[in-house]
From Swiss-Prot:
Listed Gene3D superfamilies: Cytochrome Bc1 Complex, Chain C
Protein name: Cytochrome b
Binding site for a ubiquinone: H201
Locations listed in the record: Mitochondrion inner membrane
Lineage: Eukaryota, Metazoa, Chordata, Craniata, Vertebrata
Species: Bubalus mindorensis (Tamaraw)
């Protein structure tokens, strides 16, 4: 009699994905972030579900309902802060995951990579809409500023913005629809993540060397299940340290002031995980140009496979490319810092230089370095 794990139609799918899956024997901890993202998503859906049970998506009561969750609901405060800081952990894992893909050439799995980029956009949209829900000052003005960017689209821009708002300004209709979208999108993300995995399992995992590992595979369970559990424990430890000791560390104090359309905060800025893109947006003096730069800063990831000029897949044996990759990381950290600074000298100039460097590194310098490395192989 065959094992139920291998014969049952549902169990068979799980078995082939998480138990008997042949995995490369040499994948490092950088390959942990996929499972960590799955855990983050489940955690966000669960905490979000419990928050939605007590949240009110009406402009008059939204802010009070969040205060009520924190003060009166049993363990509401921990659910709220796990959800808010869980988003930060989600983005840390996301950026690490994408960085790993860029470093080790995982973008050569075209379908997996493209679904991943779509996932990144979807998660960013979800996080943005979630930030609007507490209806604090930064929620309101963040929503106003970011949705207003669409008015830069020629001809249809203004109509599009008013259609999204459901009126002539960010108001009750906007908050209600943002809540609806914020609730449904994580389930769409979960479905997309399954497609992401489906495409990945068509080819099998990449590994640090970038060389085919077909000759040296080990079963996913117990080797990588135990490794993923360790990663999960560290993730939960980091999250709970944040939640229990400094829950407001990454938030904005302005969001503890109820939304007021008549009073603009001195510095409007998004959550920390969007600051790099916000810095790129602000560094272009033209509105439409800024919006295009903002979209392209993420959409550029789609071009990664086309910009791969090296004969080797991974950067493991390519010191020049490694150097440029870590310069890119430093550049992104600089952009993140600039995004949180006021629009004044010297921050404007630093932001513009960092923005130019960002696109220059990805579009010109890294492909050039790869070609130089190809020539060095002939020596």
């Amino acid at each position: 009699m065959t094992n139920i794990r291998k014969s049952h139609p549902l169990m068979k799918i799980l078995n082939n994905a998480f138990i008997d899956l042949p995995a490369p024997s040499n994948i490092s901890s950088w390959w942990n972030f996929g499972s960590l993202l799955g855990i983050c998503l489940i955690l966000q859906i669960l905490t979000g579900l419990f928050l939605a049970m007590h949240y009110s998506s009406d402009t008059t009561t939204a802010f009070s309902s969040v205060a009520h969750i924190c003060r009166d609901v049993n363990y509401g405060w921990i659910i709220r802060y796990m959800h808010a800081n869980g988003a930060s952990m989600f983005f840390i894992c996301l950026y690490m995951h994408v960085g790993r893909g860029m470093y080790y050439g995982s973008y050569t799995f075209l379908e997996t990579w493209n679904i991943g980029v779509i996932l990144l956009f979807t998660v960013m949209a979800t996080a943005f809409m979630g930030y609007v829900l507490p209806w604090g000052q930064m929620s309101f003005w963040g929503a106003t500023v970011i949705t207003n960017l669409l008015s830069a689209i020629p001809y249809i821009g203004t109509n599009l913005v008013e259609w999204i708002w459901g009126g002539f300004s960010v108001d009750k209709a906007t908050l209600t629809r943002f809540f609806a979208f914020h609730f449904i999108l994580p389930f769409i993300i979960a479905a997309l993540a399954m497609v992401h995995l489906l495409f990945l399992h068509e080819t099998g995992s990449n590994n640090p060397t970038g060389i085919s590992s077909d000759t040296d595979k080990i079963p996913f369970h117990p080797y990588y299940t135990i490794k993923d559990i360790l990663g999960a424990l560290l993730l939960i430890l980091a999250l709970m340290l944040l939640v229990l000791f400094t829950p407001d560390l990454l938030g904005d104090p302005d969001n503890y002031t109820p939304a007021n359309p008549l009073n603009t905060p001195p510095h409007i800025k998004p959550e920390w995980y969007f600051l790099f893109a916000y810095a790129i947006l602000r560094s272009v003096p033209n509105k439409l140009g800024g919006v295009l730069a903002l979209v392209l800063s993420i959409l550029i990831l789609i071009l990664m496979p086309l910009l791969h000029t090296s004969k080797q897949r991974s950067m493991m044996f390519r010191p020049f490319s490694q150097c440029l990759f870590w310069i890119l990381v430093a550049n992104l950290l600089t952009l993140t810092w600039i995004g949180g600074q006021p629009v004044e000298h010297p921050y404007i100039t630093i932001g513009q230089l960092a923005s130019i460097t960002y696109f220059l590194l990805i579009l010109v310098l890294m492909p050039t370095a790869s070609m130089i490395e190809n020539n060095l192989l002939k020596w």
